[in-house]
Amino acid sequence: MHRATLLALALLAPFTTLAHDIPQWHHRRSIPSKRAIIDSSSLSDSYDYIVAGGGSAGLVVASILSEDSNVTVLVLEAGSSGDEVATRRGKHHSMLYKSQLHPGISWTSSTTAQSNLADRVLTWSRGKILGGSVEIDAWASLIGDEDYWNWDNFYNVMKTIETFTPPTSDAESVGDITYDTSSNSDSTETGPTSCQAAGIEARKDPHGGENWGASNLAILPNATVVRINWDTSSSNIKAKSVVWQESASDSEHTITVNKEVILAGGVIGSPHIMLLSGVGPSSVLSAAGINVVLDLPGVGQNLQDHVGNGINWATTEATMMTIENSGSDFSKTAEWLSFISDAIAYVNLTTLMGDNMTNWISTVRNEYTASEAWIPSTDSTILAGYKSTFDVITQTYYPSSIPQIEILLSLNAANTVTIQAALQHPLSRGQITLNSTSAFDQPQIDPGYFSHWADRDILRAAFKLVRKIAAAQPIAQYLGTESSPGTSVSSDDDLNTWMNANVHTDYHPLGSMSMLPKAQGGVVDKYCLVYGTSNVRVVDASIFPMSMSSHTGSPAFAVGYQGATLIRGINNGVISTTNSSSSSNASSSSGSTTSSSSAATTSNNGATSVHLSAWGAIATLFLGCIMV
């Protein structure tokens, strides 16, 4: 076994919770010649569904909606199809993060100067490519009324979006391949077997053959959504068309929507489109000179993100990057390209704070009134929503086993071992507003890092734990001098100064279009419908109202699946939204983010109708979401 492999395996030992082994396919995919991708000359004048954003959630939404053959679906993606960078897929999975710096496939947005981080401006990369941010991610996978959004249902959705085909005997003969079928349905066995019995050959190469697009699905790359045009004749405004451009110098193009517009532009893109369309906080719209079509204070608010950094140690052993940089024959082998070299652990507050935890939590809670001063909006509904999420974090998350810190081992530098720590449930909140009225100018992004002092306290305790891990065997035998920040940085004040100058985003922002009651600053209801509209939904990670103890890739796929399933059910008359407290103009709230809900299922003309009784906290979904 290669020496770097031995080192990586040895380094895993101190971690109590490890990442599931995720197969890393090293084959380069051939580019399919027949897909749903079109150019502007093939556009129709109208579509039933227009999906703004072809990322993790948007493509799932489009795929599911197009399963109804009697509807038409259009995806407008600002980025390219990705064909021009397809050959880069041969790289080791942990090297893909370098593509974040590639302006052709990444939005290199910048934050405002962060006053609590030594006035630094941070880069926020996200995928500018069909497929979204998962196309530039460095990690492969992670793992509440009618309870579409509770843990059990959402976990089932996360399992549904993952598929597995057992290896053939030919593949099994190459190595010892094992797998667990306990979570699979009977169709995984009966389906392929029946197909083979009917004369359909099973392919040995999962990437072989040609992909054919659905005839009722069109995907248009290099199409930036400029705004939504509204019909304001009713109490709930209705999207009547979507305007897009290929570039800032291109003329505007308008496409009529027959049924619904689904925003899937992500945490930055979705609120940006809404603001440019005249929907959002009236103060933000008026300041930008945009006509206020609908005053919805929550648009762009409640922004939150994982923030972290790493401590580095020198090592004389070869690391992943040592091999990558060598250009050796081994660095090009399937063994290397499919090798997983990271380990991960999640740590709760009890482990971080020890006996001081109870008093520390009391201090945080007793200073809530001061916490409101750090929220960028003074709107009463935004403050009410923050109070609700603040209570969940400080009353439920903090004293429980729910992790507050992610610890990640990284070998991404030559002859260097890095142990990273990242905050999982920040109390700090930011916002997305406008820099200009152009869709081609990035909006103003202010994540408000460390605006609440508790976030800095937790992360500082995490770095102290990182040093304890590094001193434990067997990892200690491989580590030399601490190269950054160095052992001289040891006091709380010194660590604070170092963090302010060095922490960075973990690229897991969410919350800017939160699924909360309107009275708590919410933007969408439990059906993903934007309050005050009749046919605009948001289906992406921006609707999650609270950060989770996980990466956001898999949840983004899952929210796309769940959102599209709801949209299909509603438009096909299977799901009823009548008598729901989450209707698009609902504004009342219990004032709590945790409430029970019940489901009643009745028969209505042969169809199943589901009636939702009360809004339940989507936040409860994440109480156990600590999988990677």
Please tell me what each predicted stretch does:
Residues 257, 606-607:
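Long alpha-helical scaffolds
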Residues 593-606:
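Juxtamembrane low-complexity tails/linkers enriched in Ser/Thr-Pro and polybasic
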